[in-house]
Amino acid sequence: MMLLNMNLQELKQKYNYDVATKMMQQYLDIKFAHLDCLLLFRMGDFYEMFYEDAILASNVLGIALTKRGKNGEEEIAMCGVPYHALENYLTKLIEENYKVAICDQLETPEEAKNRGGYKAVVTRDVTRIITPGTIIEENLIASAEPNYLASLVIPKNKETASLCYVDLSTSEIVVVNVPETEILNELARLKPREILLSENLRSSNLADSIFKQLNFRITYQVDSFFAINKCEKIILDFYKMKDIKGIGEISSSQICAIGSVLEYLSLTQKQNIPHLPIPRIINFHSYMTIDFSTRRNLEIVTNSQGGSQGSLLSTLNHTVTKQGGRLLYNFLSSPLTNIAKINHRLNITEFFYSNLEIVKKIRELLKKTSDIERCLTRITMNRSSGRDLLSIKYTLETATIIKGVFCDAYGVNLPDFIEKIIKPLSGDAELYNLIDETIREDAPNNLNDGGIIKHEYHPKVAQLHDLINNGKLHIDKLKDQYRKETGIDSLKISHNNVIGLFIDITAKNVNKILDPKFIHRQTTVNHVRYTTAELQKLESELVNAKTLVISLEKALYADICSQVIEKASYLRMLASSLNGLDVFCNFAYIADEYDYVKPEFTDALSFDIVKGRHPVVEKALQRESKSFVYNDCHLSELERIWLITGPNMAGKSTFLRQNAIIAIIAQIGSFVPAKSAKIGVVDKIFSRIGAADDLIKGQSTFMAEMLETSAILAQSTKNSLIILDEVGRGTSTYDGVSIAWSVLEYIHDKLKCRCLFATHYHELTVMSNFLPALQNYTIAIEESGKDILFLHNIISGAADRSYGLHVAALAGLPASVINRAKQILLKFEKTSTGKGKNILSMESNNLSLFNLEPNKTTISSKLDEKFSTIDPDKLSPKEALELIYELKKWV
């Protein structure tokens, strides 16, 4: 940051610019223009780093730090990485959230010498800036999830923000207006790798929450970067439009969001931006809102540690292509809220579930397809290889075979919604033939290796490769011709490094060289050497053939790529079709494999699940040859809240999570783990399940819990589903019960939404007497003497205790601790004045397990306090008698 605050003169002085070599001056000029980046400076076969960049990169990458002489009195730190291993090192730098500028050589050393003489410095410049949100390399990004760059624009009224996000690797670009209160939730849905934000918001609560709560990278830009006039011009220029209405009906802040994204891509990609479609405008309310903590609690796309194993995505993902997995990731991140669209997806899933033989064939064929979205992006950005074109060719071929599977099974009787999906699978014969006729099957990854274009496609390519592969034959052919012309049978064509190719004859045959086309080059003691125009031409062709053929192939390849780019819209439709097939065949596969059922959707406020199961827990139990205990859940307008009491380890939290997960799975268009499911569409899901101390943010468990609960109560609507577990447990019992009680009342009376509320506060169960839409449920247990068995069944009724001591014993607490706890529990129960009041009778949060004094100590203290206020000489007989009766009650 210190360098960013220095002006050019100060920078030159710091690095002794005036006494630096020409090459180091070139480096410094480029570095000064990219102070916010690590600069990788191409020198021959290495990318070198200098000064502070070298010290930092050496530590991050674990590579040796060396020196490159001195600049004035200062030693120049240096480290480097081989150019062919660049991606491996970039991975580490990007993972650490560094911005990397790639500076390449724009000419060869030979070209530099021809341009400026022996001391000329090779021309270099930054060809690309790599940031977490602008990666396209397969090795640097997760193949099964999007890699979004987002721009967030907050208008002056602050009521609605605009968000534009783009996945450069697939050319997806979307813009959406987001209510100010939902910004963090929307960002949690997208998980962008990088967010563009105005410098004016650097110290805002929003920026603080994005960075600390969501842990997303923010790249700040000056406020003018988001200026409306500038952004509108950028959009019009990029899409070659005359009127911004060509984008659609968009707000000013949406224009700023789109324009700033395009500008950032232009800056980082150095004008080499891929062919992006017109941004898709979506409605924020089209997708279920799931806030960050709920996504974490439910472990939807990642587990609680940020990995994939044990997440809902890992359980449901049996797609056979990485691009299909990416679409499933998007589905799970963004469940639908429109019944018609949900049912459309469910109908597709049902079709494939009813045609499992077709599913089996399609899944095998899909394995032969490629990620043509990312292939196309690399092609449009001039970073592709022949293998990308071959991938498109093979995918086109496989697509037509897949369509044939449908036609063979159904002919012309396919449902319309399936016909629409497979329409792009007809292929594009023109595109297929173009690639088939031009690109060799063994095309290398690197264009500079040559051998990418089929010889028969272009006569000059064939000729040059013939020279490369058969140069000696051409020389021998010319030799035979000259022998015949001169009659010298001993004539040879030889080569040395001084004069190149030459005709060699013995001195005694010199009189036979009569044709003036033979030009004398050299005479030795016994030999005379000649050349001809033909031989010079052949030599030139042989020497330059490799360079010429690579140059020609690059030109031809660029032309082929331009023709492929013209088919970009079709290729994206094809990719969408194939990705959709993979996901819906996956839904059919898991429905069959795990016995899932098609859910029914209704406009009513219902959530009627029969024999529901938690898909992740069920799969884990199956690996241990155990069975999952299913449970019903029947929420409705008349029974909106289930208050669930019962022991720990009995399955309350699993039950809460499984119902939220069933709603999510249903609304992405999949069958669900249940015997039947009837669901009123859920617009938002909120959960508060457990909380860890957030010491970094200075928040205790209780504060974190209250913040989450506050957000839930503020953002929920009548159509939301709330799951709450142990609200109020992080404070004293009195406070905890009071908070839980009032939260339940608020949900019942104000929000009137569906809610599952698990608690250890059994005092709350009396609320069913005066809250008509609240019903008590508990976990069934089986007692046998001193032992209990958790049956994991949810049944109607209320628990009268939590069996905490049994759970503590199972956890392995010392027997002495358990026995002492039993004594204390008995004392608590003796002080209880009635069912449901044993906890409220004492503020247990302030009691010590090991230093609890007998009840007499408490009585003695009260007596001391009472007697200290009494003057016996002033008591009347009646007052003395009343005092005796009062003291009698204390014993």
UniProtKB/Swiss-Prot annotation:
* Keywords from the UniProt entry: ATP-binding, DNA damage, DNA repair, DNA-binding, Nucleotide-binding
* BP-aspect Gene Ontology terms: mismatch repair
- What are the recorded GO MF terms, alphabetically? ATP binding; ATP-dependent DNA damage sensor activity; damaged DNA binding; mismatched DNA binding
What InterPro entries does the annotation carry? DNA_mismatch_repair_MutS, DNA_mismatch_repair_MutS-lik_N, DNA_mismatch_repair_MutS/MSH, DNA_mismatch_repair_MutS_C, DNA_mismatch_repair_MutS_clamp, DNA_mismatch_repair_MutS_core, DNA_mismatch_repair_MutS_N, DNA_mismatch_repair_MutS_sf
Q: SUPFAM superfamilies in the record, alphabetically?
A: DNA repair protein MutS, domain I (SSF55271), DNA repair protein MutS, domain II (SSF53150), DNA repair protein MutS, domain III (SSF48334), P-loop containing nucleoside triphosphate hydrolases (SSF52540)
Superkingdom, natural source: Bacteria
Q: Which SMART domains match?
A: MUTSac, MUTSd
Family the entry assigns: Belongs to the DNA mismatch repair MutS family.
Q: What does this protein do?
A: This protein is involved in the repair of mismatches in DNA. It is possible that it carries out the mismatch recognition step. This protein has a weak ATPase activity.
| Protein name according to UniProt | DNA mismatch repair protein MutS
